[in-house]
């Protein structure tokens, strides 16, 4: 059964303990099954206390990051690449210690606009580094899920097909795709077909609107997306992601160009998203049942 989650920045960008606890309480109140924490620094957090609170509320947890430029594992600078591996290993440990089993986000290269096309050497350095991190993650009971993002946030992996090729080159069975409807709407020729093509290798999904606001108010064909996820038998985690200038994280807001205030009432946004995703999945399942029913007299 799919767990429906929510990105922590819908609630707060702070790592203060009181804010983290409020984030968890809001997540449960809005009806979600999972919280996705992003850019959570273990040095700032009571990990044991947070893990207990997550468990007490019956929530799942995932951790997402975007590698910084000075931690780009595809870099030819060995110190920079080594820092990236260190960040990834720390994130794996954090995920394990919080009781999670998925690391997601931009793991293959530095997050941000690149002014040059990627090189084969860059690709090879990244696949080799992630293959090693994936083994560490596997021992910790954690999977790596590569977010496929638009060309303005990475030059390495922009389509699901590129992600599949990348995973194949790592040789790892512990690396999967993290698909995001916002990014797919920009880069994929057909989002539904891309999902079908990636069947069996999808490990995590972000559900977000074309303008990153309320679901259903942009131009994304969510019915086609839910139909495709149902068709490939995806029954794993989906998390709602939305950003507004109402809640700003300096590390992420500039890289993702969050200039407009698309919402102010985050609880209304979250409850709407939970209902929208739940109904979308249920509708897709019911349609699949109808088209497969033979109805013999």
Curated annotation (Swiss-Prot):
* Effect of pH on activity: Optimum pH is 8. The enzyme is stable between 7 and 10.
Cofactor names: Mn(2+)
Extract the SUPFAM superfamilies matched here: Xylose isomerase-like
Residue numbers binding substrate: 153, 180-183, 212
Stated name of the protein: L-ribulose 3-epimerase
One GO MF term: metal ion binding
Q: Which residues bind Mn(2+)?
A: 147, 180, 206, 241
Give one Pfam family: AP_endonuc_2
How the protein is activated or inhibited is described as: Strongly inhibited by Co(2+) and Ni(2+), and slightly inhibited by EDTA.
Reported function:
Catalyzes the epimerization of various ketoses at the C(3) position. It is able to interconvert L-ribulose with high efficiency. The enzyme can also accept other ketopentoses such as D-psicose and D-tagatose with lower efficiency.
Q: Where is the active site?
A: 147 (proton donor/acceptor), 241 (proton donor/acceptor)
Keyword terms of this UniProt record: Isomerase, Manganese, Metal-binding
State the similarity comment.
Belongs to the hyi family.
Q: Which organism is it from?
A: Mesorhizobium japonicum (strain LMG 29417 / CECT 9101 / MAFF 303099)
CC cofactor note: It can also use Fe(2+).
């Amino acid at each position: 059964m799919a767990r429906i989650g929510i990105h922590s920045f819908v609630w707060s960008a702070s790592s203060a303990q009181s804010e983290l606890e409020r984030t968890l309480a809001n997540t449960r109140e809005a009806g979600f099954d999972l919280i996705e924490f992003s850019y959570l620094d273990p040095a700032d957090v009571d990990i044991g206390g947070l893990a207990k609170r997550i468990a007490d509320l019956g929530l799942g947890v995932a951790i997402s990051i975007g590698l910084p430029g000075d931690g780009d594992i595809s870099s030819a600078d060995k110190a920079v690449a080594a820092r990236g591996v260190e960040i990834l290993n720390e994130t794996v440990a954090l995920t394990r210690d919080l009781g999670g089993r998925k690391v997601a986000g931009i793991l293959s290269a530095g997050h941000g606009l690149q002014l040059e096309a990627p090189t084969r050497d860059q690709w090879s350095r990244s696949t080799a580094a992630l293959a090693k991190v994936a083994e560490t993650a596997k021992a910790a009971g954690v999977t790596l899920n590569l977010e496929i993002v638009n060309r303005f946030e990475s030059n390495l992996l922009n389509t699901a097909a590129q992600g599949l090729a990348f995973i194949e080159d790592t040789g790892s069975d512990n690396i999967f795709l993290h698909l995001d409807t916002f990014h797919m709407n920009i880069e994929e020729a057909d989002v539904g077909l891309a999902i079908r093509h990636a069947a069996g290798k999808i490990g995590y999904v972000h559900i977000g609107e074309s303008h990153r606001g309320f679901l259903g108010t942009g131009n994304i064909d969510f019915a086609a997306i839910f139909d495709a996820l149902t068709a490939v038998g995806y029954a794993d985690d989906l998390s709602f992601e939305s950003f507004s200038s109402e809640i700003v994280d300096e590390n992420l807001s500039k890289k993702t160009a969050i200039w407009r205030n698309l919402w102010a009432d985050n609880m209304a946004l979250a409850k709407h998203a939970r209902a929208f995703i739940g109904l979308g999945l249920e509708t897709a399942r019911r349609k699949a049942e109808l088209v497969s029913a033979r109805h013999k007299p």
